[in-house]
Amino acid sequence: KAPPAAMAALQNPYDTAARQEAAPDALWDVAYYNGRYYVYFGIVPCLLFQLPFEALTGIQDLPPSLPMILLAWLYIAAVFGFVRQAVRRWFPDASAAACLLAAVGAASGAQLWYLLHRPSVYEYAILCGAVFVLWALWQWLLAANTPLQKRGRVLFHLTLGSLCMALVAGCRPQMVLFAVLALPILWPRYITEKRLYTR
């Protein structure tokens, strides 16, 4: 969407009162510079959903609500997988009921339902980033919980987790800070036990 021509005449396009009067239909959640809008959201959701949809159907502007439903299911799957692996790693004596309650609580207590209630570009990028964060943490936990003799599986989970965390930067860059959680997950095996060192 092109910015309204009236915005170019404003001395300060970020002055709320002046902008509402001159260009009431202008977008707010974007950067405006030299007569153009710039979106600071990541490009990954567009590359994963919008572009393939347009290439297959020729229809532009896939509504964010459709891919967000798929992302919500991927989020819930990642929550259950992450909780299962976390319980296996740190609470091996926990019952299956406790594990199930923790997973249901984590999925229900997330902002997932709010994001689905208001499917827009902003919420789309947040949900996509959250999905990749949880999938990364889940895969790293799977790698940490897999016996070292199964090197192929360990490498697969480490690689998939790292790819997911890299994709987070293309959704909501500030969510990459969750990568620090790799330390408590991977530290015991790769630092304490010195598995990164060559012999």
Model-predicted regions and their roles:
Residues 106-135:
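Membrane-interface micro-motifs in multi-pass membrane enzymes
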Residues 79-111, 131, 147-157:
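Transmembrane-helix signature of polytopic, membrane-embedded enzymes
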Residues 25-70, 88-93, 115-119:
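Juxtamembrane segments of multi-pass membrane glycosylation machinery
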Residues 177-199:
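Perimembrane helix-loop-helix junctions
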Residues 63-92, 135-139:
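Transmembrane-helix motifs of polytopic, lipid-linked glycan transferases
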Residues 1-41, 56, 83, 106-107, ...:
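Interfacial juxtamembrane loops and adjacent helix segments
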Residues 127-151, 157-165, 179-182:
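Specific aromatic-rich, kink-prone transmembrane helix
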